[in-house]
Amino acid sequence: MVRYMIRYYTIEKRNEKSKALSQILSRPCPWRCSPMHIPSCQTQELEILTFQQALVPTRNDYDRDQWHYIPDHYAEYRYLLGTRGKNPLICIGINPSTAAPGDLDNTLKSVERIAKGNGYDSFLMFNVYAQRATRPEDMDQVCNLALHRENMAAFRYVLEQVGEGYRPAVWAAWGTIIEKRPYLKDCVREMVAIGEEFHAQWLCAGKRSKKGHPHHPLYLRKDEPVRDFPVSEYLDSL
């Protein structure tokens, strides 16, 4: 009888733990619930469209007058996603995930809210590295120089989208993920150099990390203000 009761108690405890785990997994979670993109291979193994090639339209299933989407089809990389306007908030993440026009992930929804809350008429989502990978640890182990070169061409294009009379507002928002790959810091340095040609203003939002990395767009208030980001000092600290 005692042995039976002990066994029954053990089974009940296991059931309770299982229910508790199910409840935890059922809670909303932006990282878990969003669709994932796991790279099929290293991008060096792919035939990459140049940025100019990627500008050529191939689809008409979204409003081109409202959206920037380059390339305009789902691929292993993405150069640009955002809305059209004269005064965009240009957000810089580390690398793209699965978002597309009209199908924004939680990061892009946050970017859109913060852009609107700070008085910008649009947003442009750009990334330090163009490879799609929901999990940063799945990114290329070594920088694909061809992809990087075209991504920098895309960054120039992004800065050129700012209307006359407006200064490019570039929101550094890559978080601590920049530490995932050594080459990412060099990519940022080149972006900053290009930004100087356009007199870009670098911004950040939210609390910076202990090492000074700018906050990722997730988990920021919709009315979170953007503020100056001392990008030169930041680069010196890397």
Predicted regions and their residues:
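Low-complexity, intrinsically disordered or signal/transmembrane-proximal segments
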Residues: 4, 8-9, 23
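Feature marks short, surface-exposed loop/turn motifs that line or immediately flank catalytic pockets
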Residues: 98, 132, 178
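Active-site and ligand/interface coordination hotspots across diverse enzymes
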Residues: 6, 31-105, 117
